Amino acid sequence: MSEFITVARPYAKAAFDFAVEHQSVERWQDMLTFAAEVTKNEQMAELLSGALAPETLAESFIAVCGEQLDENGQNLIRVMAENGRLNALPDVLEQFIHLRAVSEATAEVDVISAAALSEQQLAKISAAMEKRLSRKVKLNCKIDKSVMAGVIIRSGDMVIDGSVRGRLERLADVLQS
């Protein structure tokens, strides 16, 4: 895994720098997201691990992606195929998103709750996290019934567990001590 991240970093940096220069960061993220999903396809994974010539592999990959990739995105695929690095596309996407977040001074914040939160609740969480992290935040909302009630908020290494499940687990720990 760390090998792929090391391999992915220069590709992500090159793609990000190009995207910023051409004011197409959103488009590039969409292309990389699609390409990363294609690599996760079972048939494509077999193709990637096969002994195809890089040109054939690149053209097959580009054909599967169709119009989701522009000419520059196709060039990235060709270069990565030539170097045998198409398997690293999910990590390239991850690194690209990280570079974008750093560039835009935003933080990804996961909000996990038992039920969907209202816009007002999300706005309060967003404002509180922006104040705490001193940067803009992008909320990724997930629903997990095992939370029972309340909310779990994660950003990087920070976890704020305000869930009933978390409180019950802490209570059980105290009672067992």
Swiss-Prot record:
InterPro entries in UniProt: ATP_synth_OSCP/delta_N_sf, ATPase_OSCP/d_CS, ATPase_OSCP/dsu
Localisation per UniProt entry: Cell inner membrane
GO molecular function: proton-transporting ATP synthase activity, rotational mechanism
Domain of life (superkingdom): Bacteria
Membrane topology: Peripheral membrane protein
Keywords, alphabetical: ATP synthesis, Cell inner membrane, Cell membrane, CF(1), Hydrogen ion transport, Ion transport, Membrane, Transport
Statement: the UniProt record of this protein carries the keyword Ion transport: yes
Transmembrane region(s): none
GO cellular component: plasma membrane; proton-transporting ATP synthase complex
Family: Belongs to the ATPase delta chain family.
HAMAP family given in the database record: ATP_synth_delta_bact (MF_01416)
Self-association state and partner proteins as the record states: F-type ATPases have 2 components, F(1) - the catalytic core - and F(0) - the membrane proton channel. F(1) has five subunits: alpha(3), beta(3), gamma(1), delta(1), epsilon(1). F(0) has three main subunits: a(1), b(2) and c(10-14). The alpha and beta chains form an alternating ring which encloses part of the gamma chain. F(1) is attached to F(0) by a central stalk formed by the gamma and epsilon chains, while a peripheral stalk is formed by the delta and b chains.
Role: F(1)F(0) ATP synthase produces ATP from ADP in the presence of a proton or sodium gradient. F-type ATPases consist of two structural domains, F(1) containing the extramembraneous catalytic core and F(0) containing the membrane proton channel, linked together by a central stalk and a peripheral stalk. During catalysis, ATP synthesis in the catalytic domain of F(1) is coupled via a rotary mechanism of the central stalk subunits to proton translocation. This protein is part of the stalk that links CF(0) to CF(1). It either transmits conformational changes from CF(0) to CF(1) or is implicated in proton conduction.
Name listed for the protein in its UniProt record: ATP synthase subunit delta
Organism: Shigella flexneri
